[in-house]
Amino acid sequence: MDRRAFLTTVAAGWMVDTILPGKAPLAGRIIGASHGVGHLVRDGGAPTPSGPPDRADVVIVGAGIAGLSAAWRLAPAGLDVRVLELEQFLGGTSTWGDDGAAPHPWGAHYLAAPNPEARAALRLLEQMGVVKGWDAAGRPRFDPRVLCHAPQERIFYRGAWHPGLVPQDELDAHDRAEMERFSRFEDELTERVGADGKPVFQIPLAFSSRDPDTLALDRISMRAWLDREGYTSPFLRWYVRYACLDDFGAEPEEVSAWAALHYFAGRKLKTPELDGSHFLVWPEGNGKLVQALSERARATVTHGALVTGLDTIEGGRVEVRWLDVRDRAPRRTHARAVVVAAPAFVTRRLFPSAAARLPTRTSSPWVVANMHVERPIDPDMAWDSVLYDAAGLGYVDARHQLTELSARTVLTYYRAYGGPDVVGARKGLVVAPWEQIANDVLLDLAPAHPELREQITRMDVCVWGHAMPRPRPGFLGEQPFEPLVLLDERVAWAHADQPGMALFEESQASGVRAAEAVAPALGIALGSTWL
């Protein structure tokens, strides 16, 4: 899809202030990633620094989950750790806003209860007080105030809302039979063990089976797998498509069958308290986890810092070149070690000597829209509201977990542009004006909320050009679950692009792993691994 075609598609309806003639124009703005400045790295337009360098023990490039997790892991060592971040916010796609009736997510909005094997995630949750203790079987006990309250989910299907994501009473016999068949398979797959004695799917991914029969699923798409297994139910196909878009930002034909089935069978933790919900939820979404990492990282964060390149130099140092975007002044920092917490395509440009070893990933653009509401739009709200067969993924209610009563809230809408032409979609979104994107959101939600335009006072939108890696067929590579970490003795890489799946546990583990990998070059002992 080229840019002109994209804009024509997005603007296919009316402009926002003409949906309901005579109404005051809807307020709003586009916020988020600094696409134009960031492209200086791609285009080689940044000047070369000439002044004296400053010094640090460790420089971390990027303040997303991976970068902050690396700083968190290094904190006990008492080092001078500098984090260089382009944006004015922390957390990358896990960031949040607090300019409404409640804090609200600008990206990732929940954490599924981690498996016991996700030791780093559980360590952080225990430090936060979310994990309250451990049962006799070594399973974590969670603060019930953080587990998603009921009603958790609802779906708008055939003109009405229904509890949960599967409206059992409304499905025809064929749809119901195939959903039941798939559910049984999902349960069996969750418990299945490979020939090497490991679960076929596990989180963290490194604990998954290397069984060749299971790994063969990575050679086909999820759509091809559905065809092969004879699943023809329209609702089942929609259900799987929704899962692929929600977790990977891609259509089933663009997703490895291994990755898609991992989505359904990778969560193992079962306790009585999780019978109602497996989701850990905060008003600001995973922004709560970003705050927790930042508070514990003991690092100095420089915002508005565009890293343009790095090289190893004499004296056991790494030179990091960066641009202060506030005054466009080129600067450099000499560090004893560097963690590059950036996507593979960025890391490839920053450290060309490692380019050939980095995986090739594609990513989908996303739109996230935060709609500010002064009065309830629906008397039976759930935390997550999904519209069947809509373009977007629905919306979540930021106030769902809050106990104090208030009519005001913020509803966060998500849409992934998951087709094969991510480049065209990305280019179109980056130049699309706010009015067109906001109009698209309202039109998508109109079947369930025809009066939504009257019920919201403001809609801010964020365009994530490279939101998350898409685990396409073959993404596991020739050496599955053995991520590239050290690019050089003193340069480590940490990002969700390593495993190719944007799970919190994987991003966090990549940061912890990178920090532990550069410890020898720093001459420090971090003790036992946190992984």
Named regions from a protein language model:
Residues A102-L189:
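Dinucleotide-binding Rossmann-like beta1-alpha1 core, especially the glycine-rich loop
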Residues A75-D98:
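Glycine-rich FAD pyrophosphate-binding loop
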Residues M1-W14:
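N-terminal secretory signal peptides and thylakoid transit peptides that target proteins
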Residues G194-G309:
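Active-site/ligand-binding neighborhood in enzyme catalytic cores
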Residues W106-N115, S208-L215, D275-W282, A355-T360, ...:
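Active-site rim elements
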Residues A56-V83:
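N-terminal Rossmann-like FAD-binding beta1-loop-alpha1 element of flavoenzymes
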Residues H303-L411, A448:
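Mid-domain catalytic core of redox enzymes
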Residues W14, T18-P47, R158, G164-V166, ...:
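Conserved flavin/dinucleotide-binding core of flavoenzymes
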